[in-house]
Amino acid sequence: MSSSNWIDDAFTEEELLAIDAIEASYNFSRSSSSSSSAAPTVQATTSVHGHEEDPNQIPNNIRRQLPRSITSSTSYKRFPLSRCRARNFPAMRFGGRILYSKTATEVDKRAMQLIKVLDTKRDESGIAFVGLDIEWRPSFRKGVLPGKVATVQICVDSNYCDVMHIFHSGIPQSLQHLIEDSTLVKVGIGIDGDSVKLFHDYGVSIKDVEDLSDLANQKIGGDKKWGLASLTETLVCKELLKPNRIRLGNWEFYPLSKQQLQYAATDAYASWHLYKVLKDLPDAVSGS
């Protein structure tokens, strides 16, 4: 696919740079207004192995949204958050191996491997869970529809995360079986909407989903609309980076860049990790 086929549907380079500049200015002003602190921890960059050989009804105008601050108060007793009051957090980054599947054969093979791996991770009731997310090419022009779901990313532990480029591979039967398996809980933020969009685009429905925002309200208290970035800061004191040049970029382009693969895998990993944290917390107790 040539760039002329998609660039008019997305932000221009100048617009993306302007958005990044605005966010950078805002973050700097926040940092300057708070008490001075040491520079944020920078985690070592992990090489992405996505380009190596693989080892083992939503509305059509659905759009991506810029991150929103969480400002509402709550009347629930919350678990202690004092350790997360710093303004500068180390980055949340998936440090395992990223498996990038691009063709129907690769996706089919990897999905079958995942099914076998997940069978070893089931609890006594036969349930296992995965962090799941999707990406697609957004549209910002009136009358121009957003693209079909371009990638499905699945994380089952801290060692491997899969990024499957289904825009090119389609959804083979093995991946459909995994996605529709009701004994595999798929966790993420806004995952109900992801399920509807995937069904709209491919006729495959994500079965048995759990939205981390709802689970967070159950565990932390309140009735907030959590985003993945804000929940990451609150629960594990890390910053989930969301650079617009990647988040709002072209997810249909082949092959995906290392930066796109890292972004996609980290989102799925964050969902998986935060679910583990949340499910071990007691439910919030209503109080004054």
Swiss-Prot record:
Keywords: DNA-binding, Exonuclease, Hydrolase, Magnesium, Manganese, Metal-binding, Nuclease, Nucleus
InterPro entries (UniProt xref): 3'-5'_exonuclease_dom (IPR002562), 3-5_Exonuclease_domain (IPR051132), RNaseH-like_sf (IPR012337), RNaseH_sf (IPR036397)
Biased composition (Polar residues): 38-48, 57-67
Region (Disordered): 30-67
GO biological process terms held by the UniProt record: nucleobase-containing compound metabolic process
Reported regulation of activity: Activated upon interaction with the KU heterodimer. Not stimulated by ATP.
Cofactor(s) this protein cannot do without: Mg(2+); Mn(2+)
GO molecular function annotations of the record: 3'-5' exonuclease activity; DNA binding; metal ion binding
Function: Exonuclease that digests recessed strands of DNA duplexes in the 3' to 5' direction but hardly single-stranded DNA or blunt-ended duplexes. Also able to digest 3'-protruding strands and 3'-recessed strand termini of duplexes containing mismatched bases.
The protein, known as: 3'-5' exonuclease
Name of the gene encoding the protein in the UniProt record: WEX
